[in-house]
Amino acid sequence: MAKVIGIDLGTTNSCVAVMEGGKPKVIENAEGARTTPSIVAFAKDGERLIGQPAKRQAVTNPDNTIFAVKRLIGRRFDDPITRKDTELVPYHIVKGPNGDAWVQAGGEDYSPSQISAFTLQKMKETAESYLGETVTQAVITVPAYFNDAQRQATKDAGKIAGLEVLRIINEPTAAALAYGLEKNDGKTIAVYDLGGGTFDISILEIGDGVFEVKSTNGDTFLGGEDFDAKLVEFFAADFQKAEGIDLTKDRLALQRLKEAAEKAKIELSSAQTTEVNLPFITADATGPKHLVKSLTRADLERLVEPLIQRSIEPVKKALADAGLKAADIDEVVMVGGMTRMPKVREVVKSYFGKEPHTGVNPDEVVAMGAAIQAGVLQGDVKDVLLLDVTPLSLGIETLGGVFTRMIDRNTTIPTKKSQTYSTADDNQNAVTIRVFQGEREMAADNKMLGQFDLIGIPPAPRGVPQIEVTFDIDANGIVNVSAKDKGTGKEQQIKIQASGGLSDADIDGMVKDAEKFAEEDKKRRAAAEAKNNAESLIHTTERQLQEHGDKVDGGLKSEIEAAIADAKTAVEGGDADAMTEKAQALAQVAMKLGQAIYEKEQAAAAAPGEEAPKDDDVVDAEFSEVDDKK
């Protein structure tokens, strides 16, 4: 039975795990790392790079290196958060054909789902390489506070990557699964998950294999990227004050600054002070300029204090929704790379009044939880029941633009709820059902998930027709809505696709693009291997010809030189098949060279030289027996 893998598709890093021997195991990628940067780059020659290779060239190729795309997934281009993100990244965010936020790289426009799919493909290949078999199914994690559009876009990314997404699972819930799998004592825990781009807080009750989420809250635009941005802002302002040059206008300088900021932030988790040293960061008429700046942990904490405090408001709301106080929490589990920061731990400890639990690996625990959920779905993990919740209230727009809730936030999923509405005007023969998600009282202030029409309602006075609206949320947190006229039995239903979102045709096209990229990657790999083999053979043959050329006749020498020239021409051409063909031809001729060299050596060895001494002159060794007993 094929394995189902668990993937943590992170803003900054991604991780893949699988159940092995009843325990989740994190799989190392081709570079030997347990996590993979969620970065995709398009090189000048059209090559697509994913993970560490993409990160390494980001400084020299900022326009075409896409990172933190998870913050754009499922978002509209005109969303204020998208506008804010545009100011933070060196690459171009553009308006997609459906009004969603897309990115531009290598002269092409890509949806965030497509870019995420490239990272998922890398995770899929990592697992396949380890397992030695094809992987087609996965459980993928998302921030608990992701709305329906963001969840649907993540599922689309999985489909584009060639994966059937069996379940979308919330990151804090996944972390709780990994933390509490072998713990049977009843506990109320808080999972504080501060990652690269998002923040979640979930309150759970765990015990006897049951993981019940009581409440969840969060901020989908709060994470390590924002901490880095504060540092970049600080360094850029300091440099502008000293040199009068705005580094944020220079994409290359901005990328160098971002990398330096991230490095400084990480160093200050273990050191009290660090130095940022960026020579030749820019230049003006007076010559090159260098950025050299010392930074202390206290400086960093002062800069990011407002961001850390921003995480406490969702914590308060989650506790209130669960009907609990901070003192009622038995354990606070810290998840996400940013929880390594001493100040974050200090603030959490201060709020909950207890030392947070840091015994889980914050970068890997979510993927491990996803693998456990995969094991549950596959039947490998028994006696585990996961009860998650919907993070935001769902409802429809009613008369006067009011948001009428159908399903309240923190309702356990899957769930289904129906309510009956009527018409607003006499003889109204159609109604438009507009579906929203959020907590505001007016529909327009919430996130519109989609709309559809129920037509063919028989003429009647207002308030007479009976229209039953049903909301159905599946275990992935994805919404289906239907409306039925009770009088005629006519029904209309939609699986909510965000007012933007990707259509099935869009996804099919992107699947084909992903396959094309995978095929191109294979061709590039084959070409690189063929080139390496050909160049190695050329070098070896040239060396042998140089050392032993005097031992072969002119005809063979010319044949070898011609074969070397053909192989070099093929290498310059870059075609894998041509390089392989010419390398094979050169190998055949090289064998003749080796044969000729050996024949020459043997002939020289057999040539008459000095006469060997006769047997008569050979003297036998003389020896006498020694008796040890004497």
From Swiss-Prot:
Gene3D superfamilies: 1.20.1270.10, 3.30.420.40, Actin, Chain A, domain 4, Substrate Binding Domain Of DNAk, Chain A, domain 1. Residues 617-630 have a biased composition (Acidic residues). Coiled coil: none annotated. Pfam families: HSP70. The keyword GTP-binding does not apply. PROSITE patterns: HSP70_1, HSP70_2, HSP70_3. One of its GO terms (molecular function) is ATP binding. The modification Phosphothreonine is found at residue 198. Transmembrane segments: none annotated. InterPro entries: ATPase_NBD, Chaperone_DnaK, Heat_shock_70_CS, HSP70_C_sf, HSP70_peptide-bd_sf, Hsp_70_fam. Residues 604-630 are annotated as: Disordered. Induction: By stress conditions e.g. heat shock. NCBIfam families: PRK00290.1, PRK05183.1, prok_dnaK. Belongs to the heat shock protein 70 family. This is Chaperone protein DnaK. It comes from Rhizorhabdus wittichii (strain DSM 6014 / CCUG 31198 / JCM 15750 / NBRC 105917 / EY 4224 / RW1) (Sphingomonas wittichii).
